[in-house]
Amino acid sequence: MEFWGLEVKPGSTVKCEPGYGFVLHLSQAALGESKKSDNALMYVKIDDQKLAIGTLSVDKNPHIQFDLIFDKEFELSHTSKTTSVFFTGYKVEQPFEEDEMDLDSEDEDEELNVPAVKENGKADEKKQKSQEKAVAAPSKSSPDSKKSKDDDDSDEDETDDSDEDETDDSDEGLSPEEGDDDSSDEDDTSDDEEEDTPTPKKPEVGKKRAAESSVLKTPLSDKKAKVATPSSQKTGGKKGAAVHVATPHPAKGKTIVNNDKSVKSPKSAPKSGVPCKSCSKSFISETAPQAHSKAKHGGK
């Protein structure tokens, strides 16, 4: 840095040149001694432009500070006719364009490098986090997935087994009952047909009426006995006893009320059935063979 200053006399113009490789900084202007109150308007001319930079007065502003920089030749002048004006400042070496380019490039590199480092750091952090998650996810999911698969397989096996067992049980439970129902229905229908179709041979009126009255009375008692007695008592029937049959309680047979005193309760009937003396048929109640013999064998 180099100090600089000059005097501009009244009515004159002074040329100033910063010099090669320097810039001139205009710092201050002061009004010289004057016996009269005088004002001085200062000008600077650069190329073809003339600009006013300030006004000095003995009473109010004897000096003014500036902050003007010039990098090429310029001219200073003022309007005072009685006193001179003094300008002061300093010169500074001007940085070359190459140096400026280097400085600018360095600044740009620094500005670019800082965000790049941040972005790279963020990217690295993101990559690390993603890798950690990717490593943690399979390790956590592998045992859970295996357990879930095993549980699903076991549940499916259990459901399949339970469904098969239920279907088997239902088939086994229904088949004997259906068979028993069919057999009991066939027995009932065959007995009813045999008992309800009497064929008397003798023309005797008294016996015929007695036979008809007995035939009409006995089927009702037989039917009541058949309804009251459980299917488990038909062990001496035509088709034999059924296996594992769900039957009503045998106690219900006790609640049957019959006004006919001649008809006995099913308890007196033997388990093997009452056989007919004339043929090989057997009946559950004791009165059924009598009606059968009267209807089929003519009361023998």
UniProtKB/Swiss-Prot annotation:
One of its GO terms (cellular component) is nucleolus. Residues 265-275 have a biased composition (Low complexity). Disulfide bonds: none annotated. Residues 119-132, 198-211 have a biased composition (Basic and acidic residues). Residues 98-112, 151-197 have a biased composition (Acidic residues). One of its GO terms (biological process) is chromatin organization. Belongs to the histone deacetylase HD2 family. This is Histone deacetylase HDT3. It comes from Zea mays (Maize).
